[in-house]
A protein has these predicted regions:
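An active-site-proximal structural segment forming one wall of the substrate-binding cleft
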Residues: 98-118, 141-178
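Aromatic-lined ligand-binding clefts that engage carbohydrates, nucleic acids, or primary amines
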Residues: 421-435, 526
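N-terminal carbohydrate-binding accessory modules
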Residues: 24-77, 107
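Aromatic-lined substrate-binding rim segments of carbohydrate-active enzymes
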Residues: 63-129, 201-212
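Aromatic- and acidic-residue-enriched segments that line the glycan-binding/catalytic groove
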Residues: 92-100, 110-111, 122-147, 197-201, ...
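An acidic-aromatic loop/edge-strand motif
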Residues: 133, 137-140, 164, 173, ...
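Catalytic-core region of carbohydrate-active enzymes that cleave or remodel glycosidic bonds
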Residues: 114, 206-207, 211, 240-334, ...
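Active-site neighborhood of glycoside hydrolase catalytic domains
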Residues: 151-229
Length: 526
């Protein structure tokens, strides 16, 4: 009874935060559909002006501030991804609490008069670990990701049903803020497989999103490869693009369809070892101004990027280009939530499209910035304190073989006698440090496409240790099946005047150091 009253109180508080018109719509439910060259909100033409925000990249205490920042820009909608791997970090164990409470985030959007577009994957890209797919899928070696692999599709359906439990009641038809739900994500950049995309659509519908408007996004160059007749088609492109050209083909095949840029890239992501990416504010503002003048809907990706906390940053391909923790994206609202000059230039332009209404005031930052004084670290513990498990094997095991998603592995083997100039070769994902008898020999860096290292001379029985750190899994393209650790066999090659000799050590000790907060605290206290 007490729980029921609490729920009723929260619901009433949410309704009271709305305008009278919004309150009536919330009580009765509404409609969002496609009309003749326009979207229709409750039967009236509506231009979607969406701000892309990702709830896991923003501390929950700041969610409402960021939403209000977007509203003060002149946005009427928030667009978000649902990240499968943050909600199901262990198979079958779902977490929609705390910073993962996507339903609470959507309710905050509604409280502040914003509609919501939900993009539940299963794949999301987003410069996020493995594009949002859980690492534990890789424990099934023959799995085919983003295809009609039976196990993959089974797990997708289970996840999407959990998303439905959280969000289906929040669609506009039920009085909630959700006006659109996306099916898959930019599949044209991955392949051509309409049966797979159709199956994902059916799963999304069965998860409770059977009445809300469904759409799929892609690039203008490939959207027809997987376009489903019953879905709305939207385009993704960035600043500086020729707007008319981006929608030319869509206009030819669907002349009466509404136009929407579902990702208008405000900036770009950063990778390790490169300069911070920036894009001119002028190009962004002019592109959005042109779209609004033509009645074209959009979602600004990103309006606020935030931070890929912990191990959640992904990596790009071809090659291996890990993303940094910051997801600032050169967005109008910077990583820590402050308005940039780009924000105010955009706000000035957006004020032309408010039907004469004054934009809300820009909210103050929820907390002031501080300067951390110089300090010295005086205590440390050996890395080996963090070891939580080990296994013997006749070849190196991957993280996934050891049931570990993220962290570091320590591989140890005994060497035969080797002469100076012998070469160690293997596939190391992602950064390997090599020691012989406890002495550091060198590193092998996947970022630099390194696969080998020269070894010093060593007597028979010497111990070789390889410490491998895993970085973010690739989140784009066919390389998303990205195992971590030492992948396959390791070889040691020597050459003399008579012959070349290549050998593979057959006895390995594999030890894991998981990337886990509790594990780190335990290691420090050991």
């Amino acid at each position: 009874m007490k729980l029921t009253k609490t729920i009723q109180t929260v619901a009433l508080a949410s309704l009271l935060a709305l305008s009278p018109a919004e309150m009536m719509a919330a009580q009765k439910g509404g409609t969002f559909t496609t009309g003749d060259k326009t979207f229709l909100l409750n039967g009236k033409p509506f231009v979607v002006k969406a701000a892309e925000l990702h709830y896991p990249r923003i501390p929950r205490a700041y969610w409402e501030h960021r939403i209000k920042m977007c509203k003060a820009l002149g946005m009427n909608t928030v667009c978000l991804y649902v990240f499968w791997n943050i909600h199901e970090q262990k198979e079958g164990q779902f977490d929609f609490t705390g910073n993962n409470d996507v339903a609470a985030f959507c309710r905050l959007c509604q409280k502040n008069g914003m509609y919501v577009i939900v993009r539940p994957g299963p794949y999301v890209c987003a410069e996020w670990e493995m594009g949002g797919l859980p690492w534990w899928l890789l424990k099934k070696k023959d799995i085919r990701l983003r295809e009609q692999d039976p196990y993959f599709m089974q797990r997708v359906e289970i996840f999407e049903k959990e998303v439905g439990k959280q969000l289906a009641s929040l669609t506009i038809q039920n009085g909630g803020p959700i006006i659109m739900v996306q099916v898959e994500n930019e599949y044209g950049s991955y392949g051509k497989d309409k049966p797979y995309v159709s199956a994902i659509r059916d799963i999304v519908k069965k998860s409770g999103f059977d009445k809300v408007s469904l759409f799929q996004c892609d690039w203008s160059s490939n959207f027809l490869n997987n376009g489903l007749d019953d879905l709305t088609w939207t385009m993704n492109f960035g600043t500086g693009a020729n707007i008319d050209n981006q929608f030319k083909r869509l206009g030819e095949v669907r002349p009466n369809a509404p136009k929407m840029c579902s990702e208008f890239w405000s900036g770009w992501f950063d990778k390790w070892g490169a300069r911070h990416e920036t894009r001119p504010a002028k190009d962004m503002v002019e592109g959005m101004d042109e779209m609004l003048s033509k009645g074209i809907s959009f979602s600004l990706y990103m309006t606020h990027g935030g931070t890929s906390f912990g191990h959640w940053a992904g990596a790009n391909s071809p090659g291996f280009q890990p993303d940094v923790t910051s997801y600032d994206y050169d967005a109008p609202i910077n990583e820590w939530g402050l308005a940039t000059p780009k924000y105010f230039e955009l706000r000035k332009m957006m004020s032309k499209y408010t039907d004469g209404k004054k934009l809300p005031a820009v909210p103050k930052a929820p907390m002031s910035l501080i300067c951390v004084p110089t300090f010295q670290l005086n205590e440390y513990r050996p890395l080996s304190n963090g070891i939580t498990g080990e296994k013997e094997s006749n070849k190196p095991l991957s993280f996934e073989d050891m049931d570990m998603g993220w962290g570091t592995m320590v591989y140890t083997t005994t060497l035969p006698e080797i002469k100076a100039g012998a070469t160690l070769t293997g596939e190391f994902h992602d950064f390997a440090q090599v020691y012989v008898n406890g002495k550091y020999v060198g590193k092998i860096d996947r970022v630099k496409n390194e696969k080998s290292l020269d070894l010093p001379a060593a007597a028979a029985g010497s111990e070789m240790t390889i410490v491998v750190e895993g970085m973010g899994r690739i989140n784009f393209g066919r390389a998303i099946k990205d195992y971590k650790g030492i992948i396959g066999n390791v070889t040691i090659s020597t050459a003399d005047e008579l012959c070349n000799i290549t050998l593979s050590p057959k006895q390995w000790n594999n030890q894991i150091i998981p990337d886990d907060y509790k594990n780190a605290i335990d290691a420090l206290n050991a």
